[in-house]
């Protein structure tokens, strides 16, 4: 196996429980969206996001009320729309900064990320959530501030997560051959795309025992990845 020089990790279902995203973050943003838009409609960033949402939704001349209904409909559909992601990220930022929200990170993931960072591995995040939201979840986590572990964050602006070209672009951005990058995710479609780009990849399956390591390869946790591959460790 080619030596690993960098690790790219997904968030939802990989470093973070699915329930945190769907049962904590999404409802938190939904409950506060109307008040946030009303209070910040004149903010340049918010106004731009609302305008982008209208254009994307085909309601260019709509007011804030109709735009709000569009955004709520996108939430119901779990649509990965850029303007929605930006607004959610801004709402979450307030929650994190006020101490109301804490990013939930699996303890094994936090321990491995710190170990790998200390070992000199370059660490990156690739998630459908916005870059800002990614920084918040790791920077204000229940495992402490993991932000210093990461060199960079990628969201869907670099491409779809099931498109192999996205992974090639991430490796190119890092200045590394894809074969020297290890990608971790719970999503088989993403794993397939990463491998098609030439990356090494391991499926994280949280339904398995923590130390499980199976053909695929598939691991029950980050600690299982460390035990099986010891990425970045000198021979």
From Swiss-Prot:
Signal peptide (UniProt feature, chain positions)? none
Top enzyme category: hydrolase
Its BP terms in the Gene Ontology are: L-methionine salvage from methylthioadenosine
**Pfam entry (one):** Hydrolase
Q: Say if the entry is tagged with keyword rRNA-binding.
A: no
Q: How does it assemble?
A: Monomer.
Q: Which family does it belong to?
A: Belongs to the HAD-like hydrolase superfamily. MasA/MtnC family.
Q: Which NCBIfam families match?
A: enolase-ppase, HAD-SF-IA-v1
Q: What is this protein called?
A: Enolase-phosphatase E1
Q: Which organism is it from?
A: Parvibaculum lavamentivorans (strain DS-1 / DSM 13023 / NCIMB 13966)
- Gene field: mtnC
């Amino acid at each position: 196996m080619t030596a690993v020089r960098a690790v790219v990790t997904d968030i939802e279902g990989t470093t973070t429980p699915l329930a945190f995203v769907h049962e904590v973050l999404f409802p938190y943003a939904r409950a506060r969206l109307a008040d946030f838009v009303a209070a910040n409609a004149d903010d340049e960033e918010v106004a731009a996001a609302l305008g982008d949402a209208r254009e994307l939704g085909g309601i260019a001349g709509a007011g804030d009320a109709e735009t709000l209904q569009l955004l709520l409909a996108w939430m119901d559909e779990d649509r990965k729309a850029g303007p929605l992601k930006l607004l959610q990220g801004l709402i979450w930022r307030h929650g994190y900064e006020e101490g109301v929200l804490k990013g939930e990170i699996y303890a094994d993931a936090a321990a491995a990320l710190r170990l790998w960072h200390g070992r000199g591995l370059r660490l990156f995040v690739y998630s459908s959530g916005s870059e800002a939201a990614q920084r918040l979840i790791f920077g204000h986590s229940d495992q402490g501030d993991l932000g210093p572990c990461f060199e960079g964050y990628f969201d869907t602006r670099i491409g779809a997560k099931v498109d192999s070209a996205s992974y090639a672009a991430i490796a190119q951005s890092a200045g590394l051959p894809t074969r020297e990058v290890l990608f971790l995710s719970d999503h088989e479609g993403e794993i397939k795309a990463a491998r098609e780009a030439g990356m090494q990849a391991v499926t994280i399956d949280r339904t398995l025992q923590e130390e499980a390591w199976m053909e695929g390869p598939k691991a029950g946790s980050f600690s299982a990845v460390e035990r099986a591959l010891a990425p970045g460790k000198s021979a």
